[in-house]
Amino acid sequence: MTNTTMQPNRLRIALQRKGRLSQDCAILLKQCGVKINWNEQRLIAYAENLPIEILRVRDDDIPGLIFDGVVDLGIIGENVLEEEELGRRAANETVTYKKLCQLDFGDCRLSLAVDRDCHYENVKDLANRRIATSYPHLLKRYMNENGVSFKSCLLNGSVEVAPSAGIAYAICDLVSSGATLEANGLKEVDVIYRSKACLIQRAEPLESTKQALVDKLLTRIQGVQQAAESKYIMLHAPKEKLEKITALLPGVENPTILPLATDTTRVAMHVVSQENLFWETMEQLKEAGASSILVLPIEKMME
């Protein structure tokens, strides 16, 4: 068996060690054909089929590893990336990196929340109030943009308890369903930042073989994401209804038209649609004369 630790010049990728983002990254790499030998007890993993090394770290360490050129690529939430960037710029440090693409997972929002019984109309109601947060720089930027002075209270966890504990009047924290806020007697009042995961690269040029591998990975990621947003549609259509049926299909440009072996009045139509095909549209297609309608998922795409 080949010893992967002896391979030189591997592409180094930093990923979050635990949590939902870690799971989504593992799924994405698998979909891109990267075979990783994962071991939960080890902080470094290796690809079996490509010269790739995975560093499994805390999510808030990933931006710094990219900024400092320690790793070549990283997948990180945009909220964590921008918070770290703003913090470094506030300290007059130079920050350089390349953002290659946004990914289709890691959705979250950074929101302001207050006690459910508080009267709130807009952000100016928080003037001179104390706000607890784990994202002081994103919060400060938002409040400055709105011309509101406030007092920041930095908490690295359990931010939701701050109002009930008398630590702060309001909080600024990540929200998904809002269930945690509700459980702590809070209500979401303003979204200040929306985030997804993104793929970033260190600013320093990579050697040609590494950059070629980055380009290959990026192409595969884009193909996986495009496929996830697309459907392959097959149907039979009367020749005289082709124009009408094509107009009903969302996101379709040039369908493939094929003759049917034993039917000269109809043809087979194959199309890739980059929009969802709802039941209502399928019913409209049937009313227009289409039959044998199949809608299939697409695993991979390359244009």
From Swiss-Prot:
User: Catalysed reaction(s)?
Assistant: 1-(5-phospho-beta-D-ribosyl)-ATP + diphosphate = 5-phospho-alpha-D-ribose 1-diphosphate + ATP
Q: Which GO terms describe its molecular function?
A: ATP binding; ATP phosphoribosyltransferase activity; magnesium ion binding
Instruction: List the Pfam families hit by this protein, alphabetically.
Output: HisG, HisG_C
Q: Needs which cofactor?
A: Mg(2+)
Q: Taxonomically, which superkingdom? A: Bacteria
Cellular location of this protein? Answer: Cytoplasm
- Which keywords does UniProt give here? Amino-acid biosynthesis, ATP-binding, Cytoplasm, Glycosyltransferase, Histidine biosynthesis, Magnesium, Metal-binding, Nucleotide-binding, Transferase
Its signal peptide is: none
Matching InterPro entries: ATP-PRT_HisG_long (IPR020621), ATP_PRibTrfase_cat (IPR013820), ATP_PRibTrfase_CS (IPR018198), ATP_PRibTrfase_HisG (IPR001348), HisG_C (IPR013115), N-reg_PII-like_a/b (IPR011322), N-reg_PII/ATP_PRibTrfase_C (IPR015867)
Pathway participation: Amino-acid biosynthesis; L-histidine biosynthesis; L-histidine from 5-phospho-alpha-D-ribose 1-diphosphate: step 1/9
Transmembrane parts of this sequence: none
Q: What class of enzyme is it?
A: transferase
Q: What is its EC number?
A: 2.4.2.17
Entry function: Catalyzes the condensation of ATP and 5-phosphoribose 1-diphosphate to form N'-(5'-phosphoribosyl)-ATP (PR-ATP). Has a crucial role in the pathway because the rate of histidine biosynthesis seems to be controlled primarily by regulation of HisG enzymatic activity.
Please state what the protein is called.
Answer: ATP phosphoribosyltransferase
What organism is this sequence from?
Haemophilus influenzae (strain PittGG)
Lineage of the native species? Bacteria, Pseudomonadati, Pseudomonadota, Gammaproteobacteria, Pasteurellales
